[in-house]
C-alpha cells in the first residue's frame, strides 16, 4: 500500500488555509519527502509522521517555499538523537545550499548527511525506484517519479495442479529462484503465474512551466501531481509556472489515471479554483488540501483528510 500525504499544498507563501509545498510518500514503513517548505516539521507533527522514519528527501529546486523547512527538520532529528544517515537529493547547487544551511547556526547534526547533486538519473532502492527529470523553471529544477517495481502475477491454481505443485515452501523457493526442478521437469515462475502486475507510478513536477519532458515521464502514471499555480495565462506574467488548463492538457496527453492540481497561488479561493478546474479539465482530478491523503489500494485511489479522521 502507498500513501501520498499532502503536508503543504499552496504556492509561494503560507497562509492560514495552507502551507507551502511538502509531500510525504509512505511506503512499507518508510517516509520519503518531496520538498520541505517552511513549517514542514510542524505539518509532520500535526500529521503524526515521525521525522525519524525519513531516510530520503528530494528537493525539486531552491526557491524558498520548497526548501526553507529543511533546517528545522534536521534540527529536530538531531534533538531526537538520530543516528541513521539522511540522504538529500536535488539539482545543481544542492551541495552548496545545504552546506550554507548547516553553517548558518550554532548546531551540528550528530548524524551523517549525504548530499546527492543529480541531473536526470534512475535511482534504485529495493522495491522501488526514483527517477528525476529536468523541468523548466528558469533555474536548475527537477521533477521526480516514484516507480514501484512490477510484481509477479498471481499463482494460477490450474497451473499449479498441472505441474503437481501445492502451497508451501516449494512455491517460496520457486518465487525466490525463478525456476526449480520438480518431478524431473524444469518449472519457471512464469509457467504457473498470471501476467505481471504493474507497480504504482507517482509523478511530482515541482515548479515548472509546461514542458514536453513532464508529459514523457508522466506517461500512464497512476498519479500526476502537477503544479498549477495560476488560473489564467495573464495571471502568470513572466514567471515559469503552469495554469490549471495547461496541467489538465498535459495529464490528458500523458494518459494519467489521476491528476492532482498543486501549488495554488494564495490569491485564489478553493471554490474559485475548483470551479475553473471543473470547467477546463476533462481528466479525473483532485485539488488536495493540506493533510489530504491519497491511498492506492487494489488499483485505485481513495482520498481522505487526516484532520477529519481525528475529529
Swiss-Prot record:
GO function terms (MF aspect): 3'-tRNA processing endoribonuclease activity; zinc ion binding
Record's keyword annotation contains Hydrolase: yes
Superkingdom, taxonomy of origin: Archaea
Pfam families from the UniProt entry: Lactamase_B (PF00753), Lactamase_B_2 (PF12706)
EC number: 3.1.26.11
Catalytic activity: Endonucleolytic cleavage of RNA, removing extra 3' nucleotides from tRNA precursor, generating 3' termini of tRNAs. A 3'-hydroxy group is left at the tRNA terminus and a 5'-phosphoryl group is left at the trailer molecule
Keywords of the record: Endonuclease, Hydrolase, Metal-binding, Nuclease, tRNA processing, Zinc
Annotated SUPFAM superfamilies: Metallo-hydrolase/oxidoreductase
Binding site for Zn(2+) 2: 65-66, 207, 263
Cofactor annotation remark: Binds 2 Zn(2+) ions.
Stored Gene3D superfamilies: Ribonuclease Z/Hydroxyacylglutathione hydrolase-like (3.60.15.10)
Residue positions binding Zn(2+) 1: 61, 63, 137, 207
Cited InterPro entries: Metallo-B-lactamas, RibonucZ/Hydroxyglut_hydro, RNase_Z/BN
Cofactor(s) this protein requires: Zn(2+)
Annotated active site: 65
PANTHER family: ZINC PHOSPHODIESTERASE ELAC PROTEIN 1 (PTHR46018:SF2)
Subunit structure, as described in the record: Homodimer.
Function: Zinc phosphodiesterase, which displays some tRNA 3'-processing endonuclease activity. Probably involved in tRNA maturation, by removing a 3'-trailer from precursor tRNA.
NCBIfam families in alphabetical order: PRK00055.1-3, RNase_Z
Record-stated family: Belongs to the RNase Z family.
Protein name, per record: Ribonuclease Z
Gene: rnz
Amino acid at each position: 500500500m502507498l500513501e501520498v500525504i499532502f503536508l503543504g499544498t499552496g504556492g509561494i507563501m503560507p497562509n492560514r488555509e495552507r502551507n507551502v509545498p511538502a509531500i510525504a510518500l509512505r511506503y512499507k514503513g518508510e517516509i520519503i519527502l518531496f520538498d520541505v517548505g517552511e513549517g514542514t516539521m510542524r505539518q509532520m507533527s500535526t500529521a503524526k509522521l515521525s521525522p525519524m522514519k525519513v531516510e530520503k528527501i528530494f528537493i525539486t529546486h531552491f526557491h524558498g517555499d520548497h526548501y526553507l523547512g529543511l533546517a528545522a527538520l534536521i534540527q529536530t532529528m538531531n534533538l531526537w538523537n538520530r543516528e541513521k544517515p539522511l540522504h538529500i537529493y536535488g539539482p545543481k547547487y544542492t551541495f552548496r545550499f545545504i552546506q550554507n544551511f548547516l553553517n548558518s547556526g550554532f548546531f551540528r547534526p550528530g548524524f551523517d548527511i549525504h548530499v546527492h547533486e543529480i541531473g536526470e538519473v534512475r535511482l534504485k532502492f529495493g522495491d522501488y525506484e526514483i527517477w528525476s527529470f529536468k523541468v523548466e523553471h528558469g533555474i536548475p529544477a527537477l521533477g521526480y517519479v516514484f516507480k514501484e517495481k512490477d510484481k509477479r502475477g498471481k499463482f494460477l491454481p490450474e497451473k499449479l495442479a498441472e505441474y503437481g505443485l501445492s502451497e508451501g515452501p516449494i512455491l517460496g523457493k520457486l518465487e525466490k529462484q525463478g525456476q526449480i526442478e520438480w518431478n524431473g521437469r524444469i518449472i519457471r515462475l512464469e509457467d504457473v503465474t498470471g501476467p505481471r502486475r504493474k507497480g504504482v507510478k507517482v509523478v511530482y513536477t515541482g515548479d515548472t512551466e509546461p514542458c514536453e519532458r513532464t508529459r514523457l515521464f508522466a506517461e500512464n502514471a497512476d498519479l500526476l501531481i502537477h503544479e498549477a499555480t495560476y488560473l489564467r495565462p495573464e495571471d502568470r506574467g513572466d514567471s515559469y509556472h503552469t495554469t490549471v488548463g495547461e496541467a489538465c492538457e498535459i495529464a490528458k496527453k500523458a494518459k494519467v489515471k489521476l491528476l492532482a492540481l498543486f501549488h495554488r497561488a494564495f490569491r485564489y479561493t478553493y471554490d474559485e479554483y475548483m470551479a475553473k478546474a471543473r470547467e477546463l479539465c476533462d481528466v479525473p482530478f483532485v485539488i488536495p488540501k493540506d493533510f489530504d491523503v491519497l491511498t492506492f489500494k487494489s488499483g485505485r485511489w481513495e482520498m481522505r483528510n487526516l484532520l477529519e479522521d481525528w475529529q
